[in-house]
């Protein structure tokens, strides 16, 4: 018996930028029936890094064969493997091209056992809602604590990490390995909703506004409304705006 049905959609808008550097996808695994992988990556200074995220993720996910029961630790490792492999490939490509591509990463993996596992690197975000109410939003706090605890940075320097090329937490940074923050929730059920988005979207909304948009509309309707509102609030000065919306709904009874 299916615990839920998945409704998902992706949407993008170029904003006032000359090109779209974000990439989004919703994938199913070739050897993992019932598993769904949602991805969002924001390419810095071009789309190459974000494109590599999607390419590597598909390769790894297609080779993934799950066990018989819930195993969130294994799903989390799959997401870490995607980050590590993509980071390595981007760095190898930089040796050939002479240009270093960077990209953020947000991944959400849903299993038919009711597991939701997510991972992120950089300033793209994942939100989780229950019936439209915000319950979780990814942030930089774990990375900041890592910089203070292991790298012995001051609190001020750690919190300003985005301004430093040395400390920039992205895939492809030759100066620093990506710091992956992972989380999961068991017992997913109809009414649970997720939003993966780039900073071109989350910058213009409160958590409550995003949750309300997802709760009252289909993924397509919600994404169209959010893109239109982001363009309005940015006054034509917004950047690339991208999102993946995933909603768990009641399965249709036969």
Regions found by a protein language model. Give the residues of each.
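PP2C/PPM-type serine/threonine phosphatase catalytic domain
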Residues: 1-254
